[in-house]
Amino acid sequence: MSRRKEGTKLKKIITRTVTRKKTALLLLSLMAMLVIPATTVGPKAMGATGRSFDNLVVILMENNGYCDVMTSCGGSGSYETSLAQTYSIAGSCQSDSSCSSGGYSGTSHPSEGNYISLVGGDNFGHTSDGYCCWGLAQSSIVAKMESAGLTWQAYAEDASGSGSCSFDPPRHADHFGFLTFNEMHTSARCLHFLATTSPSNPSGSADDHEFLGSLNAPNPANMTWLTPNDNDNGHDSGVSGGDSYLSNLVPLILSSNLFKTHRAALFIVYDEGNSGCSPSPCSGSTNDFLYASWSGPVVKQAYVGTGSYNHYSFLKTVETNWGLSSLTSNDANASPMTEFFASTTTTSPPSGNQPASFWTNPLVMPVILGAILTGIVYLVVSRRRSATKRRVVQTSETQAK
């Protein structure tokens, strides 16, 4: 065999070996490229998982005390009584001013101060209706939620200006406390003020299809608020009208995608009753116990609360659930309503949107190790083949000599 042929053959062997090594390295690189996109995700709302619930729906009813509603002490809310007996009720009361166990009170008279307190932790001196709009410089629960990466939306039946800062419910801000806060007066936040269509008749089938549609959406908000109109909330139609409305609407809520597939809770509460109220800053001499009921898959069943609560307790419950700081001393000192939930998980104060960790994904290390082993095996086999071919060449050269 000529030296030229021998050199050409050896060159081909070296070229094949280098090519195989490059191929192995390319294989490892491709595997790494496949692993990283498959296991690295975009921003994740770290605050979405709550201590007791991940999603909250709130419905505000109007102007009736505990015993106006509960049939156990003379009320006429048969559906609301059944719902409370199935899931939970805050307290066992014998009158609107007396409970043998627990109880939930309003914080103001008339309505608007209660609505402001529910989202702001105080009525800020507004002890009558008619205050609107954007005048309060204080902060609300919305700002706390948004800073934690939590989402929200607030519906009002038959409002005009849906999704804009011209949003105007039938009772203006009297029954929609969000409108009193100046920080809400931005186009980004006003997008979350939404109108929903009320039933044509309070005793007919519930409509509210816009509101219900949001509960069946792929990504429901962490908190969804509903202010019914004055027929549906019992303000003008009395307990029987409001009870009929809820008897149609609540089953649709509890059978929604949100309540079937998420850790969701429904809170139904009246803004105020018909008597005095004693928790500060309310200036009554007697309690004003209200119907306040939690329901849904995360709520205890057939449970009667033993703690003493008011509207600030609702706010405290939201803050405790998602690790949010207090707005005022009122909610800071209130008791959270955690006793109503079947189980709780420890949650740290959420820190907003953060990327999920690549290395903590359980699929990452097995795939990387598999890729490395595959590459090593490929290199070993390639080297053995190259060594065998070199021996063949050397044998051929020896024989030629």
Where do the PLM segments sit?
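Juxtamembrane/start-of-transmembrane alpha-helix segments at the extracytoplasmic/lumenal side
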Residues: 353-368
